[in-house]
Amino acid sequence: MCIRDRIIGDGTAKDVTVGPLITENAAADVMSFIDDAVSKGANVITGGKLSEHGTCFIEPTILTSVSQDMRVFKEEIFGPVAPLFSFKTEDEVIKMANDTEYGLACYFYSRDIGRIWRVGEALEYGIVGVNEGVISNEMAPFGGVKESGQGREGSKYGMDDYLEIKYLCMGGLDG
């Protein structure tokens, strides 16, 4: 589905694909990311403004001409904004992606299985989506690295932070 064709509205309504942000402050924060990027030279390909549905709804936004001095480059957005970056080499884009204090989730697209494993392992993020934008489900461990947290929620790993593991090795039991 093309980003322009996304249906904005009540997240519980049939056919709606983009719901509201949790609060007006959250929406204002996302808009501040967009405004910062545009003021520093980014281009809005689509979206970039509040939706007609209200102050908690932001149109899905694609930004190009994004540079490293923009907030969208370094910070977690938590809104429907996709900043697109240009790069020349795999090593360059990995360095760019990891050059942030945050590390919750990242996404990339590739058909090359070798590249998928190389890049996926090199990215410093708790969750990596490859050729997929919907990366959360009840079976997947959810959590980040760096300033995006430690530990995982959900999945079979969700209880690990609450457990103390003890190893007991016995010998000399021959009577």
Locations of regions flagged by a protein language model:
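Generic structural motif recognizing short loop/turn segments at the entrances and edges of beta-strands
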Residues: K40-G41, G54
